[in-house]
């Protein structure tokens, strides 16, 4: 895997991450993915969608970072944005709880889909720290190398951008706090929106209104969290 034209990567990210594609971990990760596919294993998201978070939100446009763990592992769900699913796929339980908090926090009606592309288009970097998964096998690609790549993404965006909001939901996301310059960015933490934990503090966290208040205080347009209908 090299940072050349064989990888469709948005130019600002390609430049910022160029050195990562020459690292030994990336060679090992590429080999692992090739071997998994050769063994007939189905990998999500589909290849062209793996870098969707970066391609949807150029480095200099990032305002908010939401961290996820690894992609959804059901057919047709993952498309490269954490917590989001492709059009026509029901919203998974964690996303339903995100919608419940949006309703409570900003009185935004719960949409009938789970496609969060409009957030990414407005500057919300929706990054899974592991960017691929095997079908029906959660965390199958954990510790295969993606963590080095996505740690570097977090470091780069923290360094390059002046005033970001990081939403860190759950212990895994919060373990990345050490990569973030909290002297200039707003770091919001909560339990994960999973049904197993959301009632312990995610529901009621107010992260969406707090994000927009911080953005406006720093001269940035707020995020329109209300999702457009999917046609």
Curated annotation (Swiss-Prot):
Gene this protein is translated from: ung
Enzymatic reactions: Hydrolyzes single-stranded DNA or mismatched double-stranded DNA and polynucleotides, releasing free uracil
Primary location: cytoplasm
Superkingdom of origin: Bacteria
NCBIfam families from the UniProt entry: PRK05254.1-1, PRK05254.1-2, PRK05254.1-4, PRK05254.1-5, ung
Family statement: Belongs to the uracil-DNA glycosylase (UDG) superfamily. UNG family.
Entry's localization field: Cytoplasm
Protein name: Uracil-DNA glycosylase
Enzyme Commission number(s): 3.2.2.27
Native source organism of the sequence: Pseudomonas fluorescens (strain Pf0-1)
InterPro entries: UDG_fam1 (IPR002043), Ura-DNA_Glyclase_AS (IPR018085), Uracil-DNA_glycosylase-like (IPR005122), Uracil-DNA_glycosylase-like_sf (IPR036895)
One family name in Pfam for this protein: UDG
UniProt GO cellular component terms: cytoplasm
């Amino acid at each position: 895997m090299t940072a050349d034209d064989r990888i469709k990567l948005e130019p600002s990210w390609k430049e910022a991450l160029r050195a990562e594609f020459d690292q030994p971990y990336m060679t090992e990760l590429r080999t692992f993915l090739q071997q998994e596919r050769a063994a007939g294993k189905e990998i999500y998201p589909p290849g062209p969608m793996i870098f969707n978070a970066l391609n949807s939100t150029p480095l200099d446009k990032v305002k908010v970072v939401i961290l996820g763990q690894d992609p959804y592992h059901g057919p047709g769900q993952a498309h490269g944005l954490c917590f989001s699913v492709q059009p026509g796929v029901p919203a998974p339980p964690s996303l339903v709880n995100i919608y419940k908090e949006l309703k409570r926090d900003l009185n935004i009606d719960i949409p009938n889909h789970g496609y969060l592309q409009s957030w990414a288009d407005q500057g919300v970097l929706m990054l899974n720290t592991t960017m691929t998964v095997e079908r029906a096998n959660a965390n199958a690609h954990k510790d295969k190398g993606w963590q080095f790549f996505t740690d570097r993404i977090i470091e780069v965006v923290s360094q390059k951008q002046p005033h970001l909001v990081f939403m860190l939901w759950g212990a895994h996301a919060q373990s990345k706090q050490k990569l973030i310059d909290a002297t200039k960015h707003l770091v919001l933490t909560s339990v994960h929106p999973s049904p197993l934990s959301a009632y312990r503090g995610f529901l009621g966290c107010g992260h969406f209104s707090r994000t927009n208040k911080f953005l406006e205080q720093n001269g940035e347009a707020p995020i329109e969290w209300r999702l457009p209908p999917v046609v």
